């Protein structure tokens, strides 16, 4: 889980995460018009097909990033938030550190290849979890199957949205170096699981193996409550404090997945 890998378009989860933060903090609005720069328009790879001199809304850009995996949309939104993609990458790195993604370094908003643009599957899992927890309403974008912009309809590349009704996200990625990648999440009953797969040899393989991993995990692990929120879990003796004993607990209810039958 700690091996350095290229995240490819899985990068765009962080791009969207920062955009959702900006919306929450009222630094952006969904209907805000964004001017498309020549830089964004000329970005290579998967595209939403935005055009210079044709403003696009923040909401359209988010759909272009999440559903269509548009590199052009990612750069346009990065510029709207930070002024330049380079400045936005700095924000991405600062946010990664705050989330505990200590083995991740971003160089761009898209995931286009760069030797210094790397992460780990562990860090990707952290990012996916925080996206779902911190922006539960906005996470619904990842369940959308298609989006039409500029009269061009594109389908979500996450095949699991069609293959399994319990799957409600998240994001695909692909470069020659990264292979075919997929972070997927499914909720069955009260349980949600996230899987991260990188380096598959085809779109079909990444979908098939991700679904196998989800099914295996649901079948072979149970979720148990370790500690309730805001309840004393342990007591610790305090040296020269205002009290001899301090009660320690967790802010949020803590669940853990354990092998079934333990």
Residue ranges and their predicted role:
Residues 102, 113-118, 122-262:
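Domain-terminus/edge residues, biased toward the C-terminal soluble/receptor-binding domains
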